[in-house]
Amino acid sequence: MSYDLPKSALEWKNKIHSFVQNELVQWEIEAEMNSGEIPTEASIKHRKIAIDMGLPGMDAPKEKGGLGLSMLDQAVIWEELGKVTNALSWCFSEAQNWMYEACSEEQIKNYINPLLRGEKKECYAITESESGSNVDGGINTTAILDGDFYILNGEKWYVTGANKADFLFVQAKIGKGKNKDKHVLFFLDKDTKGLELLSSPLFSHTYSFHHHTYKLNNIKVPVKNLIGKEGDGLKYTYSWFRHERLMIAARCCGASERLIEEATTFAKERKSKDGTISDYQAIQFMLADSVTELWA
């Protein structure tokens, strides 16, 4: 089965396919054998190539220095990147469109534009022990205004990429006052006093981005680090969720295609009696089912 992509999407597909096949795939085994780590010079090279292509700004508006790509173009990019292990494809951060809509000029200067230029990395501290996707009802981290600062207290789980990040997006609820229980989102520098690393759980993957658990102990966050206004936090988090989950789905499709290709190649090469296991209908059925499910 095939379908025609618009010219721009096809150009991106070919460009990223070349990047994956010529630069990334060759490092897969080493990355898988070393918890996602590869030599620093190779990692720097991959990051530079991604930055030179403009990938950190694929969703950022053109007038802000980004590429302003369509969602289809972005999905095609992430589908191709999905054909290699995340240990290698996650070689750049993203400055997304919603950030330019939500953030002040000072925040854009200090946090978002450095993402766009590939100078900083971010992570998201949203999830808690009682909140996964139920961000609205399960957030217990509080933010209480005290003069020119908000005081944050709580605990955050599965903060993916925290070990390599420069700053965090932190979700909380107003702890008291007229806006009590309304959601807020903050920028938090990782070296802020009171940010305590509790643990870094091991997952069954092989990339170098860890999933820290943090405790927030009376952290003082400047009012200027509030994104938008009190009550805006949830809609901005949902903006990130929508974009991220679409691209995760695209990446999974790319991974599935790669897996089917690898399985097919193996079946054609694996000897069995006078032929290969690809001669067996049972194997053919499984591969055909996999292709059908992918295209469905």
Predicted regions and their residues:
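A short core secondary-structure module
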Residues: 140, 149, 153-198
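Buried hydrophobic positions in well-ordered alpha/beta secondary-structure cores of metabolic enzymes
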Residues: 9, 20, 54, 61, ...
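Glycine-rich phosphate/pyrophosphate-binding beta-alpha loops
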Residues: 132, 157-162, 206, 244-247
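Internal helix-loop-helix
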Residues: 44-47, 51-121, 160-167
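Short secondary-structure junction/hinge motifs that connect adjacent elements
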Residues: 27-50
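A gly/ser-rich beta-alpha-beta helix-loop segment of oxidoreductase catalytic cores
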Residues: 103, 121-145
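Glycine-rich beta->alpha junctions and the first turn(s) of the following alpha-helix
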Residues: 3-7, 11-12, 196-296
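Short Ser/Thr-interspersed hydrophobic loop/turn segments at strand-loop and sheet-helix junctions
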Residues: 54, 77-82, 172, 188-193, ...
